[in-house]
Amino acid sequence: MKKYVGLAALLAAAPLYAADLVNHADNRPASLDTGAQKRVQVVNVWATWCVPCRREMPALSQWYAAEKRQRRGVRVEMAGVALDKPADVNRFLQSVPVRYPILRYTGNDSTAWMHSLGNPTGALPFTVIRAPACGNYRKTLLGEVSPQQLTQAVEAAAAQCRAG
């Protein structure tokens, strides 16, 4: 029975690491897997047609640039995941450049993929702060996020990493 519970947990997490992400810059396969590293990961899921997504991205980019200079004893990484076609993402990023990597979701069911990240509704924008190697910390933020919300969630995740 224990073996099946472990397998079920592994399968439940599988969509998170499936080959449905590519790096927008070079179209190579990408992953949100942080491995055993004690890192805090901020993942912002967005689309070019989503007005709140477009509005929050400049602030997210500025927050990340400042966050990279902070020293919390734990590395903070950020990625944006676009639910769009490459040409649409290119056009958007030309007008609103960001300072963090942009990935694209290429799978067939973005709603199920977002559910696997903790988004119960599939609504955008959606941000998740994760620290899988630090007690599997996860905080989900639905809707437009503020730099203050991100800082609070990252500080909580970093504290858990330092404690563990």
Residue ranges of predicted features:
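N-terminal signal peptide c-region/cleavage motif recognized by signal peptidases
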Residues: A13-A18
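Short pre-active-site segment immediately N-terminal to redox-active cysteine/selenocysteine motifs
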Residues: R39-Q41, W46-W49, K85
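Structural microenvironment flanking redox-active thiols in thiol-disulfide oxidoreductases
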Residues: R55-P97, N108-W113
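Thiol/disulfide oxidoreductase modules built on the thioredoxin-like
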Residues: V96-V98, Y105-E155
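Bacterial N-terminal signal peptides that target proteins for export
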Residues: M1-A8
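Non-globular targeting/processing and membrane-anchoring segments
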Residues: A159-G164
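A short beta-strand-turn-helix
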Residues: A19-Q41
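The canonical Cys-X-X-Cys-His
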Residues: V43, C50-C53, T127-R130
